[in-house]
Amino acid sequence: MKSVITTTISARDAAGRFPSRSDLESVQGNIQRSAARLEAAEKISAGHEGVVKEAGDACFAKYTYLKTSGEAGDSQDKVNKCYRDIDHYMRLINYSLVVGGTGPLDEWGIAGAREVYRALNLPASAYIAAFAYTRDRVCVPRDMSAQAAVEFIGALDYVNSLS
């Protein structure tokens, strides 16, 4: 699984070199932000059911046509799958916060997602709306500290930027 630390070590090892000063500063910054990332991961874990439900509800409220016949949410089974997908991405965001890098999202979430959504007639914009709602709903200090919110929002924005 990729993280800033494993990526730095792998790149330098492949080049047959020791990590540079800037490499070590990058790793140090990553380590210094770890407490905030872990706080965000803990808060997401504790309230993930509510976060997923609100994100899914926001998605279907914005894209009401999804529940019409022939669309991605035209049955309860399909609606449940949408919520399942949002939950899956929230877990990957959580894992990415824990490891301190985008590895879980890159390796398990993003690869092929666009093709799958296209083949199943699932609009990526609906998922983007769900994560944008989650991002905009984060409230400091109600939900988490300011630094934890920065880390969480960064992970949400990373997912949205790849869509």
From Swiss-Prot:
Keywords: Antenna complex, Bile pigment, Chloroplast, Chromophore, Electron transport, Membrane, Photosynthesis, Phycobilisome, Plastid, Thylakoid, Transport
Chain sites annotated for binding (2R,3E)-phycoerythrobilin 2: C139
Subcellular location: Plastid, Chloroplast thylakoid membrane
PTM comment text: Contains two covalently linked bilin chromophores.
Residue numbers binding (2R,3E)-phycoerythrobilin 1: C82
InterPro entries in the record: Globin-like_sf, Phycobilisome_asu/bsu, Phycobilisome_asu/bsu_sf
Role played: Light-harvesting photosynthetic bile pigment-protein from the phycobiliprotein complex.
Subunit relationships: Heterodimer of an alpha and a beta chain.
Name by which UniProt lists this protein: R-phycoerythrin alpha chain
The organism of origin for this protein: Aglaothamnion neglectum (Red alga)
